[in-house]
Amino acid sequence: MAYNASLFDVNRILKSQQLIEDGIQLESSLLQICINVIFSFTVLLIFCIIRPKYPVIYESKRTLCKSETQRPDALGKGWFSWIKPTFNIKDDTLIQYSRLDAFTFIYFVRMLKRLIIIMTIGSMAILLPVNIVTALNTGDWPPASILGFITTPSFYTSDQSDKSKIWYWCPTIAIWLYSILIVGHMIMASKSFLRLRKKYHTMLTKDSHRIEDAVSRTLLLYVNEPSKTTIERDKIKCLVHQFSNTPSQRIATGSYNQHLTYLVQKYTSIVNKLEKSLVAYLSKAKKDQNDDGAAEELDTFKRPIIKLGWWHQIKVDAIDYYTDQALTLSQSIKRNRNQLQNADHLFAIYADTYSAHQAYVSLLNKTTEQHALIQKVALAPHPKDIIWKNMTLDHDTRKLKRLFGHGLFLSSIFLASFPIAIVASLSNLINILRFFHKTRRTIANNRVILGVIQSYFTPWFMFFLFLISISLLRYITQQQGYRTKSMLEQKTLIRVFAFFVIDYLFIFTVFGVLIGILGQMTIMARLLHRERTTMLSRYVFQMGKNIIGICIHWINYICINCVGLAFQLLRPLALIKDKQDVSDFDFTKNYAMVLSIFVATLFSSAIVPIILPFALFYFGFATMVFKYELMYVYTVKVDTYGKTWPVLYCIILCSVIAFQLMMILVLSLKGALFQVYSLIPLPLLTCFPLVLHGKYLYRKIHPLQLELNNDDNDSTEPKETNNPTPNDDRSARWIEKIYRDPVIRRPLIKPCIPEEYRLLIPQVYKHHRQHQLILKELFQMKSRKKSSRTNTINTTRKSKEEESERVYYVDPIDSYYDGPSSSSNSTEPSAPDLEMILAESPLPAYVSPKEQTL
């Protein structure tokens, strides 16, 4: 009788504490939902009002993008005229204006939205009613609060019978169905994506086909030591010819200078600052006087001043200072371009794709067995995708950087557990207060404040912490020496996912549950005069109930992310800075945010199914926002042709496995052993499609050229290369040009001064001792259509010194340059795209692999 009485007291105390927690949690959650709804609608209304007034910011892709193929049609001037065009954007239109990577992102978000729709319908129609019926027939009735009707772990008390455990089969079946649904949907979506990707390649222009054909004909080879002499270079070339089935047309040795990267970055920054100072100075003079007057009395206007030194005590003329810096850096860059060293990589160019792939297979087998000089053979990545500053890293340095990066990543996971523990404590602030004596009245008198801290400020803190974590993990990954941007982004995304699962789901849940159970057991031990350890060991079942609070926290997190989407649409930082340029869409960050919402929803779907409607609203809103941004605001400079899809597939299936393991843990805490046994095979079964279909996707997508070769060129034969034509040699020389480091071959940018101010430039520098040199080096008064760089490309080679100083038309998208400054209208063109090379140095007419066989 004493035991029953004690057990009755325990249940009564737990129920009273749960009633207080659920009441505060429900009130605060409703309050934060109302605040976020009002906040989001206010931000959206502000966006609708100011959008027509600032087309440079909210339609920057249309107003500032130089590429005709990526410039969309103009939107209307009405407040809500952006909604219908964005909603009606078709996939073909999105691919045309934003390339395949943008479509891949929208396709992935839409796929997750479809999954959430199916899960929401099933949960609202089956799982939620079953939870209510189960709570009515077993456990505490009436429930402590409305949360007891809709959550799974609130079914039962500690004295539940084996007969009542039959109700656990409902969430168990839901776990099986969710797993089958997600895995099957991912496989079908992957097959559809491969078909769309193949269709996209057929939609490419002829110039794009030529570029892809040129890239597919090139192999990238790494040697153990850079060749320092002509004899060593010839030896490597002979080895490549010997081990290949067909001789290569050309072999280009990589070259570099260790100082050029820093010099070019510094030069670009100085030129942008010089441009801003000049435009501000000349526009002020132009505003007060006409053209003639301004030219005559330009010296009367105050020139811009900057402060230098540790304490900013030295004042100098900003225009003269930046000009001298730019001139010095320009001359230093020219000198360093004449002092190049051979790198440990080279590019072998073949006559056609078939010959290149046959040589790749042959070199891959023979070099590892017969000769150790050639260290690695790979298909050459696209020039836009290469991180050139990492191409010159030797094998030992790259290996050391990889190990150091792995150590930093593991350290970041450990260090991030401390702020995550603080977040978990703030989300359980009531139980933290229960550790202290006489806090019951404090909790009762400050319900609103405690609820707002738990349900509103804590999710915001987690949201900003996650954004900081993404930037930190990207920085760590950048230090590991990956050679391509696509690989860098994929590795960053994988690490962000692992970081989120370990810290934000596992550690946050463990800390939250432990703090909750310790706080409740502290009150119980104090009231029943027992040891807290005895209470904790006997009433472990209460941990299952405390998981509900963690799941409710993710509902608040989803609402905060909806507000974040509204601010992402408003772009307040760009509005404040008056930033007038076309930014690149941050795929890694947005993928990470979308995946965090989906994974958190999946983890809570079987416990708190009410989270699914909130996730459905988020994905619907996210689809709208991201479509608008990709269509009208951001550009996609580097198109990897959907290489991220295999990584996304593996991440989703890994999240399914983690969800299954967590539910096994929750059910084991509730004592549902038969249900746990039925779930044990599920993670093992999920591993099969993860491994098998993941490898299939990787073979299909990495690289694009292999897929096209296997599908279309099974019967093709290599072209005769014994007597190469002039067009073939010209094409090989062009490929060699685009596979040179941009800091070596790219023209230096010039200050972009509006045409009405350019006549005043000589007056600005008439007092300078290097007046003529400045006008010649930094301000080329030539038209935009006929640049001196065009004549440079078309001229013949004269000498080795001229060749080293020559600058070529190359693709402007690389990691060294920020692009042309946007503080004024551009009159000095930046280096053109690869398509512009084709227009000025035309390659032979493109012939498809199928036509080559005819």
Go through the PLM ranges and name each one.
Residues 2-789, 797-800, 808-813, 818-830, ...:
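Transmembrane transport/permeation module of multi-pass membrane proteins
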